[in-house]
């Protein structure tokens, strides 16, 4: 019995030592802000009417961070919002100062950018010359319109090259908008053998690997779904600690609100037999009753897929093409990013191809250009989802819906064939990825012109005409 009591006492002392009381404040313009959520990555608290918060911080905590309220922004340092402070058991306090976010209340645009992934100085120079000007044009346009804008980089910010973190961060800081980070598998230090050690470089530049912030009427949650084992070995999984943290956060949200969960690896790989991440299922259950969106990268392809009722995943194509090797992604999606908008509670998205007009959302091939469908017009609609309609007109006459099919992208296939013909070695991740956002229609022998019209779920209409070359 004595030994048991000693054991229980030791456990209680250990538990007491596992948390330390901390204190801090949240202000805006020097005035206290109440009701702001604060977390150590394990538990939550809120600031009171004087803007003061207290929290028993876990000894394993790495940061004390705010859930930035809608309509406010933490000061930027190198483009990164400073909504966090490194946890220091000896610190006397954690004081945060927020600022109002100018622009129409509740309206914003979010640039979701996947896998910039420079590995070499050459890649970095190309990031600067090929990718950043198009992103800069998008944010410059937003400033001209007076729009609130932010960016989120969906992991693989670098490609096993932590020495490039500072340069990439500086490039994104140049956009002049808050930039939120997501950690990817290639952002881990491959020379470390625990997940905590392997994220140290990333955390030094971008802060916590999981956190939350609000914009408009949407609650954004960023998670780390890469469990790293060292030497490039990892699992696509959300660890138990983060799941508990997210579930506790879910309990604090208003019923029926919108939640966007940003991670690197997708929750569901719809193109691989709906192969899902088990932990993501638990996450969806935790946020049941909310409108849920996953925003992910990692795959170098583009997909908008309804995982279950009320849950949509936006898997965003790689912004630099396929690993800087190819001019488009291996599913045929152009280099680009997903642009999310919210205003007055209305939430929408649209793919933006780098250097192209927003109106460019489809690509059409003539009969005879696609070997698998030699007599058909073939259209690619890379941001398609099941709520789109894709119809066609022949010489101005409506002909109905086109037939959806799965294809290797003709342009990407031609590119790879040209590399092979030139004697180039092709990586296994350069194989064309069959995708189901292609549509076919067979025009009549006398047809002179075909128009393809694609309309997205928000009623936006995109079209492309081709002349078939018949003469009298």
Please tell me what each predicted stretch does.
Residues 20-23, 27-42, 59:
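Short, ordered, surface-exposed loop/turn motifs in non-cytosolic proteins
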Residues 250-271:
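Short acidic, glycine-rich surface-loop motifs adjacent to enzyme active sites
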